[in-house]
Design a protein with these regions (language model features):
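Glycine-rich beta-to-alpha active-site loop
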Residues: 83-133, 158-160, 308-316
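NAD(P)+-binding Rossmann beta1-loop-alpha1 motif at the extreme N-terminus of oxidoreductases
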Residues: 288-347, 370, 454
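Conserved N-terminal Rossmann-fold NAD(P) cofactor-binding segment
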Residues: 334-382, 392-397
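Conserved CoA-thioester-binding segment of acyl-CoA-metabolizing enzymes
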Residues: 1-51, 67-68, 79-82
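Amphipathic alpha-helical segments at domain termini/boundaries
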Residues: 1-16, 105, 109, 153-262, ...
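Rossmann-fold NAD(P)-binding glycine/threonine-rich loop
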Residues: 397-448, 453-467
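Glycine- (often His-adjacent) and acidic-residue-rich active-site loop
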Residues: 52-83, 99, 127-130
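Gly/Pro- and small hydrophobic-enriched strand-loop and loop-to-helix capping segments
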Residues: 111-133, 169-188, 330, 334
Length: 484
């Protein structure tokens, strides 16, 4: 069973233990309901805390069970949430790191919620062509307001816990912990406090009982529906999110839940949903390398050097600047360097002008950028990426020089799209550190990153580059040294 049950004094703690993100698979769901039953039958237990072990509270559904009978087998998530609501003893969700999809819906079914600062909160189902299917569209508007909830549900984007806690009148969090480290103790303290408050039979607070209205009613939803329609690119799910949240303001809670479930099941059968789920699963599969375990040690990459300030070099640099990683660009001539930096600056200024980037973020990113005309100045970089002319003689000169100046353990990457990475690696005395990182043009826009594994590329180098790809928000796909 992938949920752990322990009693700490007079509080039962149910810890989700289904790495990597505590997906709510069948075994985990059974563990939660069994834990709730055990706690309610133990006279010594006065309150219950549900939390997540490892790196997440819960990332939602267990993708390993997508499309299998286990995904809907009882207790399904709706039943688990109902068990939380019906608990005779207060249930506190202690949320940290990530609470997404079904994980957030589970927390919304608890009587109280405390979150660590920096926790990512989201209902991302729209990105799979769906709407939340376990009460998210009905409960979230009741705790943060209709507009804030609809923005989250339609976009599917994550918002940090401390930002949500600042919303006027929010009832999503009863407390924000001082830190992730102090969350367990603060959750126990909250559980004991609310247990004392309910000792005399005070009814449990249920999100489902909170009011849900919007002052502009129909006019607001029609405006929102029109706006979403223009942005949805013919995908049905965003518009259906609006319908479901509108139902939360007009229907009784149970009727709204039925309406949400009907929409969810109908969307599951659409070609758009099937396609988006296929893309999601393919993206996940592409990140897994059979002979490179997930726990393979990775090298620290805290600084990057890019050789070449042209179109590719500038675009590559922006990816790392966007991720908060310092970049030093090397060129042979000052005018080429100046043109490259000017292009980067122009690209960022265009984003600022369009309102896509705040001025302070622009300033932060440009402050991370430095330049040089000397190889000697890049030797301490953790990763160096060459983006020079696509000719083997040029690559040979570059990599022989990198072999001389780069510190031990630095990763030497080539942006080549056609040349032999094994041949390039042979120009160095450290072929285990050489790898291909083929960005597609424009490199700061295109999502795909082709990671070319040479015959002698180290597993730690490959694992590191795949992790870097994720950090700079690329879809990384491993290829061999071959055509195609």
């Amino acid at each position: 069973m992938t949920a752990e049950y322990k009693v700490q004094g007079d509080v039962a703690v149910i810890t989700l233990m289904n790495p990597p993100v505590n997906g709510l698979g069948l075994s985990t769901r059974i563990g939660i309901t069994d834990g709730l039953e055990k706690a309610n039958n133990d006279a010594a237990v006065k309150a219950i805390v549900i939390t997540g072990g490892g790196k997440a509270f819960s990332g939602g559904a267990d993708i390993r069970e997508f499309g299998s009978p286990k995904a809907i087998q009882e207790p399904n998530l709706l039943s688990v949430i109902r068990a939380c609501e019906n608990s005779a003893k207060p249930v506190v969700a202690a949320i940290h790191s990530v609470a997404m999809g079904g994980g957030l819906e589970l927390a919304l079914g608890c009587h109280y919620r405390i979150a660590a600062p920096g926790t990512s909160i989201a209902l991302p189902e729209v990105k799979l062509g769906l709407i939340p299917g376990a009460g998210g569209t009905q409960r979230l508007p009741r705790v943060i307001g209709v507009e804030a909830a609809l923005n989250m549900i339609v976009s599917g984007e994550a918002i940090k816990s401390e930002m949500l806690a600042m919303l006027p009148g929010q009832k999503l969090f009863d407390a924000i912990a001082q830190s992730a480290e102090s969350l367990p103790e603060e959750a126990l303290a909250l559980a004991r406090k609310v247990a004392a408050a309910h000792a005399d039979g005070l009814p449990m607070p249920l999100v489902r009982n909170l009011p849900c209205k919007h002052p502009q009613g129909d006019a607001y939803f029609q405006f929102t529906r029109n706006m979403v329609k223009g942005m949805a690119k013919n995908l049905p799910a965003p518009g259906k999110c609006v319908d479901a949240v509108e139902a939360a303001t007009k229907k009784k809670f149970e009727d709204g839940m039925v309406f949400e479930r009907e929409i969810f099941m109908a969307l599951m059968m659409t070609p758009e949903c099937r396609a988006l789920r296929h893309i999601f699963m393919a993206d996940r599969a592409a990140s897994k390398i059979p002979d490179v375990p997930e726990d393979t040690p990775k090298r620290d990459v805290k600084s990057v050097a890019v050789i070449g300030a042209g179109t590719m070099g500038g675009g590559i640099s922006m990816n790392f600047l966007n991720a908060g990683i310092p970049v030093k660009i090397l060129e042979m001539k000052q005018d080429a360097l100046d043109r490259g930096v000017a292009t980067i600056r122009k690209n960022y200024e265009a984003q600022v002008k369009k309102g896509k980037l705040k001025q302070e973020k622009y300033d932060e990113r440009m402050a991370l950028l430095s330049t040089t005309l000397s190889y000697d100045d890049i030797g301490q970089a953790d990763l160096v990426i060459e983006a020079v002319f696509e000719e083997m003689g040029v690559k040979e000169a570059v990599f022989k020089k990198l072999d001389e100046v780069m510190k031990p353990g630095a990763i030497l990457a080539s942006n080549t799209s056609t040349l032999d990475v094994n041949k390039i690696a042979s120009f160095t005395k450290r072929p285990q550190d050489v790898i291909g990182m083929h960005f597609f043009s424009p490199a700061n826009v295109m999502k795909l990153l082709e990671v070319v594994r040479g015959a002698k590329t180290g597993k730690d180098v490959l694992a590191t580059v795949m992790a870097i790809g994720k950090k700079i928000k690329k879809t990384s796909v491993v290829s061999g040294v071959c055509d195609g």
